[in-house]
Amino acid sequence: MTKETRAGAPADRVGAREVKDRATSREQRILDINFDTKFPEKREITRKTGHAYGGRVDDIIDNACAGCLANCERTFSQTSFCQMGVATLIGFSIKDSVVIMHGPVGCGSQSHFMDFTIRLYGLQRGKQMANARWFSTNLSESEVINGGEQKLRDAILEADRRFRPSAIFVCMTCAPSIIGDDIDSVLEELRSETTAPLVPLHCPGFKARVFSSAYDVVYHGIQRAGFDFEPIPYIDYEPFNPDDPDYELKVRQYQYTRSRTINLYNAVSIGAQDEAEIRRLLEALGLNVRFFVEFSHPDDWRFITEAALNVAMCHVHDLYFLEYLKQRFDMPYILPTIPVGSSATRGFVTEIARFFGLEDAAKKLLDKEEAKLKGALKPIRERVKGKKVIIGGGYMRVGTAGLLADEIGMAVAGMRNFNYDTYGNQLFQEIEDTLGNVPTAISNQSSELVNMVKKLKPDIAISHPGLGIWMNKLGVPSIALFSQRFTFFGYKGAYELARRIDRTLANRNYSKNLSRNIELPYLESWYEKPYNHYILDKSGEVVGAEAI
């Protein structure tokens, strides 16, 4: 593994660059997935995703292509995200669903806040969502020793009887995974006794260090649950009655609409305003836009295959399912950059337009939108120019937010990604070309985040929700990297994010006052070490110790 920074790059860096160039071509980015297994492999295996690294942008790109990121480990860590928590978020977002957490009752402690949240997010989309309905099998010491499959059977039947849900998502947590409970056999046994499809989710926290593996777990469970994605033949459509004198006209109208229809795949981190902004841009090109799968009903999923193209708004979230639809139904898909900021939005819309032969129309639209945005950002740019920002969260959001920060004249002091793989190389190559060789960590550890911020001394942070409190305790004001309450996507989102940065920098008293009255739980000796002191490569050496 290469540990030198750009200033001391070894001679074999050229070879690594050639590997990177080959790996980032779309033709090379093919997933080798077996959709017939009980559960999917973790992303450390399928995508060589790394969860621990310290260095700079060029090091991360090179080592991602070489597969070295997956070899890094920590000799010390605090808590980290659990893939079960991520899996339940998607389950809650499916209209009229029920989630069953098979495990001790404490595994559901983080889910109470989702009740109001899911209803609100649904209403923002014009949909009446039920409460976040979930059961726990509440395994006791006795069941942990003797098995809890009977409790799971009872919970499934009770959930189906009480709610008649659209789907029942069954989460396999750590304890039953360790003792060997067979949820697949239980679900197979009960399929004929329930009205709801039963979706197995093998998501114990210890199973994957890359918590985004949970997205693959959910989509794998959905495709195994028996939902119908088969295209509906014309003859089965009532409007397409062969005896109808307008039969041929209606079929042609349908075929034309389908040829201009795209499916966009959302996430809980993508708000209704984000969806509206992207819909506005794509419908201006004459395209028909639909959103799946979150905040939709499983009955609607049958129409997924009635489209010309699938598009991931965040491929970290949806690539697994899009690959399944491609292999099973020959549906093409593209993976454009998440549309935050002018550069990423132009790339997102242009790539979709190219598929439909609409590049010229897209260029005219985007030129006009960018001119309006540039004028709106001018006064903001004058006030925030030169201010230092650190950005942390999922790598697609982090990278595009960094390009937006540069667009308004800010200096990106550092980036901190929860994980990283080669699917980010095209974006991060643009970051290196535009922003320079920025210090970049791969970390989900609060201790490393605090150390990094102490050394970089940013004026402001853009943080994954829930982590801004660490910034504010350090005296650094923070705004959210994403939120359902605001717009982030497209040109409207670029302006709103820039405006929030401007307003936050104008008054930093809250974070300053908080830092004067809060003592963080870390020793001064920790701040004297590199933030990546505990991240080692397979030879036992610290990775990227001179990055900051």
Question: Which residues does each predicted region cover?
Answer:
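An N-terminal assembly and electron-transfer interface module characteristic of large anaerobic redox
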Residues: 2-548
